[in-house]
UniProtKB/Swiss-Prot annotation:
This is Probable lipoprotein EnvE. A lipid is attached at C21 (N-palmitoyl cysteine). Coiled coil: none annotated. It is a lipid-anchor. It holds the Pfam family Ricin_B_lectin. A lipid is attached at C21 (S-diacylglycerol cysteine). Its main location: membrane. The keyword Membrane applies.
Amino acid sequence: MTLLSGKTTLVLCLSSILCGCTTNGLPTPYSINLSFPVITQNQINSGGYYINDAEQIRTTDGLCLDAGPDQQNRLTLRECKHVQSQLFSFHRDRITQGEKCLDAAGQGTKEGTPIILYSCTGNDNQRWLTDDNKIKGKQSRKCLGTNSIIVRKGDPVVLADCDFSRALEFTIR
């Protein structure tokens, strides 16, 4: 069995009894290639794409980053559930969900800039570092946070000064 392009190829050789093959120079055994999708534990199929190794980004307050469809790509904090809108993948300095990247809207660098999901461009406003359980924008040097000191379900996720209480601390699960 070999793994190739997200599919498993199984090569079967028919025995000499079934195909009349011999080992003394006559025709070699036949091969049949069968392809079928491989489903892994962390794989989610939705809209034709897969999220591999997807994880929740949880606050220390027990809420999760959520990019639900009713939020128009804006991230908010929601009760943690195992739903696609709360699963993110980590690729070096990018955080993605499907084909979209975590993005400081409008290439913003100021406190209060909304965090959204946006088509991946490779710009620095889509690059993130982790430091002391915080997620910090490479371009802005600001952390993911909220506009209020008291974190509540439904709060929008924005850029916040990393040294103040509006910056959120996260665990990845």
